[in-house]
């Protein structure tokens, strides 16, 4: 997983 792979919700 990448560092900016988290969904921004």
Swiss-Prot record:
Belongs to the periviscerokinin family. One of its GO terms (cellular component) is extracellular region. The modification Valine amide is found at residue 9. This is Periviscerokinin-2. It is found in: Secreted. The lineage of its organism: Eukaryota, Metazoa, Ecdysozoa, Arthropoda, Hexapoda. The keyword Secreted applies. Mediates visceral muscle contractile activity (myotropic activity). One of its GO terms (biological process) is neuropeptide signaling pathway. It comes from Musca domestica (House fly). Keywords: Amidation, Neuropeptide, Secreted. The keyword Secreted applies. Disulfide bonds: none annotated. It comes from the Eukaryota. Dorsal ganglionic sheath of fused ventral nerve cord.
